[in-house]
Amino acid sequence: MRLITAYNPPASPARTRPADRAPLRVAAVQQSWHRDPAEHRAALMEGIRLAAGEGARVVCLQELTLSPYFAVLRKADHPAPAEPEDLATGPTFAFAAAAARAHGVYVHASLYEKAPAPDGGDDGLGYNTAILVAPDGTLAQRTRKTHIPLTEGYYEDQWFRQGPADDAFPLVKVDEANLGLPTCWDQWFPELARAYSLAGADILVYPTAIGSEPGHPGFDTQPLWQKVITGNAVANATFMVVPNRVGAENGLVFYGSSFIVDPYGRVLAQAPRDEPAVLVADLDLDARRDWLELFPFLTTRRPDAYAPLTATG
């Protein structure tokens, strides 16, 4: 598995005083899905082992970590529909907890969570949920995906309901850093990144499953995907850690290109499009402070002028 590192973070060009916080070393594991569950877990565990061996404090895994990307098909058309799992007792948490304990790191993962609808009923849907497991194997935080795609090849509305609006932007503290745990399609919405930044997020982790467009086979969205995430990093003074998957599943070709970007829009580390990789980078956490002091986006906002953002329809 290819290892790509970015240590000794670049200087913060807006810095006027020494940093108050130590850098945080994070990792993103880019992997393909393996049909054999044991082989798949072993491949992911090897990525976690490599990252931990490089001193990563947090290791981030792709969307629907242990699963194929089953939303490439509508549920009614799927030959073997995936079943949601219990967050606390299911295989994803068990895997992440075992990896966290074995390697003494925080492990971030993603799962199809079994949970009742907000009204207590059964709507046939679950949540697309990101979790962070602490080194002692306990759940540090969980976040349900807020925005759900519904386009060809990404029929997530057939499988997942939207995450609750009143619990959309929780943070978790890792050492001196505040992390947010949104998921994939959330990365296209500037409102979400802004809400997390206002809450004090230093780092957003976006587990991702994105690749080709079945209805537009000649359209490569990878450059746009990276640009929008990078733009949101700059506009909100947050680091972005983005683990995507690679490989082909049911005609969908995932384009990898996992990356880690800083609040100045500088890509610290990037994976190739077509092979597994582990990215490990040091994040200068106070680059956020420096950039917001020079360009105070958060304190010069005009919420009184933003009514169209909350209009429906």
Residue ranges of model-derived segments:
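Cys-nucleophile CN-hydrolase/nitrilase-fold catalytic domain and related Cys-dependent amidase chemistry
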Residues: 37, 45-135, 142, 210-231, ...
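Short beta-strand scaffold segments in enzyme catalytic cores
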Residues: 109-111, 128-132, 170, 258-260, ...
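C-terminal beta-strand edge segments of enzyme domains
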Residues: 2-14, 231, 239-313
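CN hydrolase (nitrilase-like) catalytic-core segments centered on the catalytic cysteine
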Residues: 85-108, 178, 184-277
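Active-site catalytic loop in hydrolytic enzyme cores
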Residues: 3-10, 85-87, 115-203, 207-228, ...
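Short amphipathic alpha-helices and their capping/turn segments at secondary-structure boundaries
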Residues: 11-16, 42-59, 191-198
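Short, glycine-anchored, charge-dense loop/turn motifs used at functional sites
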Residues: 26, 132-141, 261-269
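Short beta-strand segments enriched in small/hydrophobic residues
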Residues: 19-32
